[in-house]
């Protein structure tokens, strides 16, 4: 009996996974299982009466009929229901009618139940009348010819633009094949190895997404491997200039294994010296702690990491094992290659500034996004298996990368800052950025508005920028719109009425809020009036003069007057209470930390590690730096972590 049970169990598992599911599909396989169980019962009962052969024939016929009926009547309906992915929907259908309505919206262009996953293609026409197809794996959308195009293209193009001359590239996860197609647009590429565990996904990429991926999977330079990514990395003799790893979200069953430290170590072992590894991560259906775990794990192997934004809620980590500094001029030349330019033109990226504006955190900084003590996800301690699913359940979003986006700052540490220092923003740059942001979407609307304001300064009579400003003002009212009307109110605009100290404080608060809201790497608003009032308040409001001096230091720094900013900062922290009043910043508690981050940043840029470390230790004694937590000013915490780790590494050497 034991032997028969064992043989039956093994045969059932093998036949179901490798034969019945791929051939019959999930619904018919379930019907077959029901029929076989009923057949066994029917034959068992018949054996007592001696009619085993007749019962067996009857049972087989009944099972075949059941499978045929289910396949013909329920097959497509079953498939439609399962690929909808309602388990992700925060608002499930309220009725059967609504459920059927949702299921009928899409045209099921392809459906296949494979041994490892159910793969489907849904075709739909959007509101603009444009057709689009979406790849769904186990009910979860993993690629499309619509809103996902920017991420799919940039996952291939960004590392290719950053690398000086990539010849061999590995892509983990086929998806739509668009990433592979984008990589193949570079003439230096001799071979792309594509590793995908599901043959159904590669079939979809080859047959359905060919118009969108440049028919990449039929390109002779593309070599497709149906294999587990870890197995491939551990067995291939090849080395690669770039590895792009883009599995699904880590909360999907089994996917967290390709976010582990061991997996990244396997990637590093197959990278050539100077190679880059790019990891697609999602900011949606997650949280800051899960995001920190992914960054810390990736950074434990590739410590020189930068963070890039590829769409509204999709991000890309690009890391190297050694310090990495891209050549911006060479990047511009690669961007100008006709095939590359045409590929990026599909997502309105036409100029170097379009590419550089996507970098959120600079090389060498992104590793320090994760607080000290963040748990590393490994095969032996798979914390992401639980944490990612927990974060998915509460439908959160990782906000740290957006709060730390360097594009929001007038003097970014990113490649964009380096580029703008050499080539100031032009009207054509602004036009290109506006098209790009409108195409891919961007969560930080103030950045978009700052581009439009700079464009308006450069071309005040251009009807396009005026139309865009008015459109976005109507659709997305600016948070500083009310502030702008208040600061121009007669009570504030008439300087003679400002003998009232409370009115002066309120005006300074409003002007500073407007300044902070409007500043970015692209545009710095005029701050003369703000500086005049803050300067006056340092004399007229001695009880709060430390706050006024600290704010004035911040604005001076934004304007590039570093010497004045340093003097004001030191005065604001001076222990002489008789001269500067009580050491109290309760009116603007975040202002000192912001200035501390700027001063540490200045030392790092100047290569003065000792000066940066002295400031970190000083500010830590003051209670502003707590690198083990995701609290306080996040830029300050990130820079402090970088200084401490760099100093420790220098001592060890």
Predicted regions and their residues:
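Structural motif corresponding to the intra-repeat A-B loop/turn of tetratricopeptide repeats
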Residues: 440-442, 476-477, 514, 559, ...
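"A position-specific structural signal for the A-helix of alpha-solenoid helical repeats
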Residues: 432, 468, 506, 513, ...
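The AdoMet/dcAdoMet-binding core of the Class I SAM-like
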Residues: 140-295, 299, 311
């Amino acid at each position: 009996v034991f032997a028969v049970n064992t043989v039956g169990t093994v045969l059932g598992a093998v036949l179901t996974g490798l034969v019945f599911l791929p051939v019959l599909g999930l619904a018919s396989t379930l019907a077959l299982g029901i029929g076989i169980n009923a057949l066994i019962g029917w034959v068992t009962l018949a054996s007592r009466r001696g009619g085993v052969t007749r019962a067996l024939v009857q049972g087989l016929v009944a099972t075949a009929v059941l499978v045929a009926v289910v396949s013909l009547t329920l097959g497509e309906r079953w498939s439609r229901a399962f690929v909808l992915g309602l388990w992700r929907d925060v608002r499930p259908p309220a009725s059967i009618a609504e459920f059927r309505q949702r299921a009928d919206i899409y045209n099921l262009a392809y459906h296949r139940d494979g041994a490892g996953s159910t793969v489907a293609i849904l075709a739909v026409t959007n509101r603009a009348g444009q057709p689009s197809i979406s790849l769904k794996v186990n009910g979860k959308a993993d690629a499309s010819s619509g809103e996902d195009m920017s991420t799919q293209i940039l996952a291939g193009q960004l590392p290719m633009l950053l690398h000086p001359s990539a010849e061999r590239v590995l892509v983990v996860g086929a998806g739509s094949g668009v990433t592979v197609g984008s990589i193949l647009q570079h003439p230096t590429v001799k071979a792309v190895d594509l590793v995908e565990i599901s043959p159904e996904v590669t079939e979809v990429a080859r047959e359905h997404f060919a118009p969108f991926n440049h028919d990449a999977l039929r390109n002779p330079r593309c070599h497709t491997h149906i294999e587990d990514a870890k197995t491939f990395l551990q067995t291939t003799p090849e080395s690669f200039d770039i590895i792009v790893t883009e599995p699904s979200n880590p909360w999907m069953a089994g996917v967290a294994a390709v976010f582990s430290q061991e997996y990244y170590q396997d990637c590093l072992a197959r990278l050539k010296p100077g190679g880059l590894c790019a990891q697609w991560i999602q900011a949606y259906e997650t949280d800051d702690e899960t995001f920190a775990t992914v960054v810390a794990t990736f950074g434990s192997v590739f410590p020189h990491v930068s963070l890039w934004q590829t769409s509204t809620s999709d991000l890309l980590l690009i890391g190297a094992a050694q310090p990495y500094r891209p050549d911006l001029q060479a990047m511009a030349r690669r961007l100008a290659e006709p095939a590359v330019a045409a590929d990026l033109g599909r997502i309105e990226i036409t100029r170097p500034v379009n590419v550089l504006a996507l970098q959120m955190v600079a090389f060498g900084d992104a590793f320090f996004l994760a607080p000290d003590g963040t748990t590393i996800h490994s095969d032996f301690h798979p914390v992401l298996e639980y944490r990612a699913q927990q974060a998915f359940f509460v439908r959160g979003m990782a906000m740290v990368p957006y709060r730390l986006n360097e594009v929001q700052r007038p003097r970014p540490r990113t490649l964009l800052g380096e580029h703008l220092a050499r080539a100031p923003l032009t009207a054509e740059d602004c036009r290109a950025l506006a098209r790009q942001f409108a195409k891919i979407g961007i969560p930080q609307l103030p950045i978009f508005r700052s581009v439009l304001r700079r464009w308006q300064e450069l071309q005040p009579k251009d009807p396009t920028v005026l139309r865009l400003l008015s459109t976005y003002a109507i659709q997305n009212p600016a948070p500083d719109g009310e502030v702008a009307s208040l600061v121009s109110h007669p009570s504030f605009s008439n300087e003679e009425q400002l003998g009232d100290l409370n009115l002066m404080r309120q005006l300074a608060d409003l002007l500073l809020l407007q300044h902070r809201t409007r500043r970015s790497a692209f545009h710095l608003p005029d701050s003369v009036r703000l500086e005049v009032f803050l300067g006056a308040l340092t004399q007229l409001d001695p009880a709060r003069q430390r706050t006024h001096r600290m704010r004035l230091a911040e604005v001076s720094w934004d304007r590039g007057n570093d010497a004045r900013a340093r003097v004001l900062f030191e005065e604001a922290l001076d222990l002489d209470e008789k001269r500067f009043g009580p050491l109290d910043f309760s009116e603007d508690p975040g202002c000192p930390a912001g200035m501390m981050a700027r001063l540490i940043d200045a030392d790092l840029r100047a290569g003065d590690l000792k000066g940066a470390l002295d400031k970190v230790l000083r500010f830590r004694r003051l209670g502003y730096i707590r690198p083990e937590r995701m609290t306080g000013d996040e830029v300050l915490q990130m820079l402090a972590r970088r200084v401490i780790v760099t100093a420790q590494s220098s001592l060890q050497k």
